């Protein structure tokens, strides 16, 4: 497998943190060119702070972290402290970061990196609202054909919504941004709730993280201890779904995932279904496919990979 050059666009978030750790623990497959923070689970000052905390937890204070957009394109920001806590990384007690944010805006970093790197070599990995990505596409459309692909966490169809009856949080926060990305023509792989709700941290899986006996393993276990309470109370699930790590795991082990290439459109007008990812699973619309919609994962294989990689940190 060729080395994947990626930019992680993120709003940490406990599951974002695990995704970052997985990427930084996998240098044979993944080269992280930089991390851009976006407002989402918590406001931008906290997501930018949390991204640096996680880099230091992984032993990578050299990683370039940039602050991006602090609000959606045209709507007030909606956050998810009720899920992730006031800091966004509630659970473990982690030291404040000592590494500095890079001075450049995250969107400028995305644009400049895609213009500089060889065409077709960079994958964008958005783990939060798509505001930074859409802004980059809008301001510099020349970068779109230079992408390898966009592998994102967002959306839902058969699994329905987690912030409204029909919408997944990342898409709902900035549906106009999602519409720009899905209509851009960029190759898209999406990890919707349909697959991420199958990547559940059961007690034995969380015990395996804790049993690693490392700071990263302990932190992930404590993040999950906090994060899982919402899903257990709301959905009666067996544990916390690791949404965002599915993006990184797909880059390392695509064979763990299955999906279907279909048309996905974003609802931006209806107050009833705002932010819905309208997925033409049965190809009845006649619209051209624009996304690989991932629907299933080998959960045991996923957690084996994740545990093995966290053991490196």
Regions found by a protein language model. Give the residues of each.
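A residue-level signal for conserved active-site and pocket-lining positions in enzyme catalytic cores
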Residues: 65, 181, 248
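Short, conserved catalytic or adaptor-binding loops enriched in Gly and charged residues
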Residues: 55-58, 285
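Active-site histidine-anchored catalytic micro-motif
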Residues: 2-53, 61, 87, 93-198, ...
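Short, mixed-charge aromatic SLiMs
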Residues: 42-46, 50, 74, 156-160, ...
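Conformational coupling and interaction surfaces
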Residues: 2-3, 22-25, 29-31, 172-176, ...
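Acidic/polar N-terminal loop/beta-strand segments that form early-domain functional surfaces
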Residues: 37-40, 68-70, 269
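A short alpha-helix-loop-beta-strand transition element characteristic
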Residues: 59-66
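Surface-exposed loop and adjacent secondary-structure segments within mature catalytic domains
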Residues: 66-94
């Amino acid at each position: 497998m060729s080395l994947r050059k990626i930019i992680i666009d993120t709003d940490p978030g406990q599951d974002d943190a695990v995704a970052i750790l997985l990427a930084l623990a996998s240098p044979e497959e993944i080269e992280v060119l930089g991390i851009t923070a976006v407002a989402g689970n918590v406001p931008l000052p906290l997501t930018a702070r949390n991204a640096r905390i996680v880099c230091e937890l992984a032993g990578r204070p050299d990683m370039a972290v940039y602050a991006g957009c602090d609000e959606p394109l045209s709507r007030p920001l909606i956050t998810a402290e009720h899920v992730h806590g006031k800091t966004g990384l509630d659970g473990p007690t982690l030291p404040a970061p000592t590494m500095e944010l890079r001075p450049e805006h995250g969107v400028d970093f995305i644009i400049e990196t895609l213009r500089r790197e060889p065409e077709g070599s960079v994958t964008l990995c958005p783990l939060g609202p798509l505001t930074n990505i859409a802004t980059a596409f809008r301001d510099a459309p020349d970068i779109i054909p230079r992408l390898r692909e966009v592998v994102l966490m967002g959306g839902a169809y058969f699994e329905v919504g987690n912030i409204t009856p029909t919408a997944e949080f990342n898409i709902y926060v900035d549906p106009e941004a999602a519409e720009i990305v899905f209509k851009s023509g960029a190759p898209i792989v999406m990890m919707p709730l349909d697959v991420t709700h199958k990547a559940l941290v059961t007690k034995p899986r969380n015990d395996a993280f804790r049993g690693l006996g490392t700071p990263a393993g302990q932190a992930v276990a404590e993040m999950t201890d906090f994060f899982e309470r919402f899903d257990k109370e709301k959905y009666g699930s067996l544990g916390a779904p690791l949404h965002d790590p599915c993006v990184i795991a797909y880059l390392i082990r695509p064979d763990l995932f299955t999906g279907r290439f279909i048309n996905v459109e974003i609802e931006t007008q209806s107050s009833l279904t705002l932010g819905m990812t309208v997925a033409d699973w049965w190809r009845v619309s006649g619209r051209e496919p624009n996304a690989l919609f991932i629907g299933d994962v080998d959960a045991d294989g996923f957690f084996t990979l994740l545990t093995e990689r966290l053991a490196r940190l």
